[in-house]
């Protein structure tokens, strides 16, 4: 039985400001979930915090590439150091974000160790890159593209380890059925995508078990689970920067996560995007914590 270690990665460097003169509030995610006693309820060990650099886009303008890139690069390396240490020790890191750019830290850490896959549970694939968009900037919407080697070198080739993820080792779950253009590109790259509709048709548990089994091959050392809170329907999880309709319901997400987290090949989990600034009563934080705790209940 591996030790679960809860580690904070409260970086908001990869999101655009919600309004002029403000910063994204998702950096408070870790504190909000800790207030819901996630560490105690998971019977987890304390992993501390990897403190991020200041959010400061300076004089960045559209066309300048990824904003906060230097800060994200340095933070990715420091976060990777911490995650790598726990993975090599046989722990199971649960990383509390933060925005989705923290996934780069996990991807880099695991690339140092070997060949790992990614099961990304997200409303959108976060696959924006210069080949499909002229609006590059927010790494929180680009981290899977960056992780697979698409984008600027100061983020895609840290330590000369490009790519951190192979296309064939990535799986997406919870993508909205309406995002046809995104799905078409991923299909052309043969990256499997399970939409919300697919999940309901085929069954979350069966899909997750098949995915975990697919990662249990001699060629792959394991996989990481990336959980973006916006995979949930806004009716139950409105506290995200880009709420998209027709998302997963809590029971569906638990059913998807359980077999993934229970797999001996699963190396860890990160939780991102939930914004306490949009959840003044803390109800969404309570729900998200309940989902994660329930998902580990049989793992």
What is the predicted role of each segment?
Residues 2-299:
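Conserved alpha-helical scaffold segments that buttress catalytic/binding sites
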């Amino acid at each position: 039985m591996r030790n679960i270690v809860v580690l904070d990665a409260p970086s908001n460097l990869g999101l655009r400001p919600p309004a002029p003169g403000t910063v994204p509030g998702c950096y408070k995610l870790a504190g909000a979930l800790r207030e819901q006693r996630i560490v105690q309820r998971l019977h987890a060990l304390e992993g501390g915090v990897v403190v991020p650099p200041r959010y400061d886009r300076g004089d960045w303008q559209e066309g300048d590439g990824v904003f906060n890139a230097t800060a994200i690069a340095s933070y990715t390396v420091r976060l990777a150091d911490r995650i790598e240490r726990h993975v090599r020790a046989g722990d199971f890191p649960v990383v509390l974000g933060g925005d989705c750019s923290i996934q780069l830290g996990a991807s880099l850490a695991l690339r140092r160790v070997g060949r790992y896959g990614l099961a990304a549970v997200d409303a959108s694939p976060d696959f924006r890159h210069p080949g499909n968009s002229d609006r590059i900037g927010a790494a929180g919407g680009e981290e899977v593209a960056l992780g697979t080697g698409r984008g600027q070198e100061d983020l895609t080739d840290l330590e000369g380890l490009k790519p951190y993820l192979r296309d064939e080792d990535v799986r997406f779950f919870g993508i909205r059925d309406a995002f046809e253009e995104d799905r078409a590109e991923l299909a052309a790259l043969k990256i499997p995508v399970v939409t919300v509709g697919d999940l309901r048709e085929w069954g979350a548990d069966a899909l997750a078990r098949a995915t975990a089994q697919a990662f249990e091959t001699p060629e792959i050392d394991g996989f990481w689970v990336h959980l973006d809170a916006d995979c949930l329907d806004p009716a139950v999880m409105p506290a995200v920067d880009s709420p998209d309709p027709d998302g997963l319901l809590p029971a569906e997400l638990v059913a998807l996560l359980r077999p993934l987290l229970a797999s001996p090949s699963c190396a860890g989990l990160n939780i991102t995007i939930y914004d306490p600034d949009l959840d003044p009563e803390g109800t969404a934080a309570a729900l998200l914590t309940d989902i994660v705790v329930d998902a580990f209940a049989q793992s």
